[in-house]
Curated annotation (Swiss-Prot):
Signal peptide as annotated in the record: none
Organism in which the protein naturally occurs: Chlamydia trachomatis serovar D (strain ATCC VR-885 / DSM 19411 / UW-3/Cx)
Biased composition (Acidic residues): 180-194
Compositional bias segments (type: Basic and acidic residues): 143-152, 278-288
InterPro entries named in the record: GrgA_tf
Family that this chain belongs to: Belongs to the chlamydial CPn_0623/CT_504/TC_0791 family.
Residue ranges, annotated region (Disordered): 126-227, 258-288
Composition skew (Low complexity), residue ranges: 126-136
The protein's name: Uncharacterized protein CT_504
Source taxon at top rank: Bacteria
Basic residues biased stretches: 153-162
Length: 288
């Protein structure tokens, strides 16, 4: 941002180690907060604003609508790395050869003791420049190396996670495509089966039109042979013989239709008799 007149910086708010600053909207809690390491309290006229110290992600927020909170930095140590990893320990054969020699045996006399002490001191001074051990690293360098290693580990872990997520997404999408294709094939096969059943179940069209009128059945003329005539004559003869025999056997019971009609007419002509007359008539007939 560019200002015609630079704002007045009232103060700079920084977070402690392991913490970060969260600038959250106090009126709209649904809005995502700004998480930064340090902010400036800037004043323009009578109003004050919060401005990010990191110019790569600039923002200018009114102090009356936003609140500043200190939150713990959510960092997970994916791999425990010691701080003394960068210190090199000399353990080669050359270092063993450059070790100071054992001091000689000290004699009882005072002169000899002084000489032996001088020899030991001289040997140690000679061995010191020869060995030249590596100086231990400072705390800042250790922290830098530790941060670099953590950053590399995080990058590797992120790549692995991304590759796994991509593989899982591809696998799930492939499974979804396969299931959808199978369902489509099943639906198409069922639709084809239903269509074929419907097609075969349709009634065939009529051979004649309604305007032509009803179709007259054709009488099949079968040729009449002499064998059929003989069989029919024999059947008639046998039936007539049977009728005659039955008539002769039942002469008393057989009554022709004309006689039946006459008896019915006579019975209708006779007046109806009472019960006593009928009884008398029955007795007379029985005596006769």
């Amino acid at each position: 941002m560019y200002f015609t007149r630079d704002p007045v910086i009232e103060t700079v708010i920084t977070s402690r180690e392991g913490y970060k600053l969260s600038i959250r909207n106090s009126k709209h809690l649904s809005q995502d907060p700004f998480v930064v390491e340090a902010i400036e309290v800037v004043r323009l006229g009578e109003t004050s604003f919060f401005r990010n110290c990191d110019h790569s992600k600039p923002f200018l927020l009114p102090a009356s609508d936003y609140e500043v909170m200190e939150i713990r930095d959510a960092k997970i140590n994916l791999k425990a790395v010691g701080l003394d990893r960068g210190v090199k320990i000399v353990g080669s054969r050359e270092a063993l050869l450059k070790m100071p020699k054992v001091a000689p045996i000290v004699s009882v006399s005072e002169d000899n003791t002084i000489v032996s002490e001088e020899e030991v001191v001289a040997d140690s001074t000679v061995a010191a420049p020869a060995s030249t051990p590596v100086a231990p690293m400072s705390k800042k360098e250790r922290r830098k190396e530790f941060k670099n290693e953590k950053w590399k580990d995080k990058k590797k872990q992120g790549r692995r996670r991304n590759s796994k997520e991509i593989a899982d997404a591809v696998g799930s999408s492939q499974e979804m495509i396969d299931t959808v294709a199978e369902e489509c094939l099943q639906e198409s096969s069922s639709e084809e089966g239903d269509f074929s059943e419907r097609r075969f179940s349709l009634i065939p069209p009529p051979t004649r039109l309604i305007s032509d009128g009803p179709e007259e059945p054709e009488e099949e003329s079968q040729p009449v042979t002499s064998v059929d005539l003989n069989e029919s004559l024999n059947a008639l003869v046998s039936e007539s013989c049977n009728v005659i025999e039955s008539i002769l056997a039942d002469e008393d019971t057989v009554v022709f239709t004309k006689e039946k009609d006459q008896t019915a007419e006579e019975s209708q002509e006779q007046p109806s008799l009472s019960l006593e007359e009928t009884l008398v008539h029955d007795r007379i007939s029985s005596e006769e």
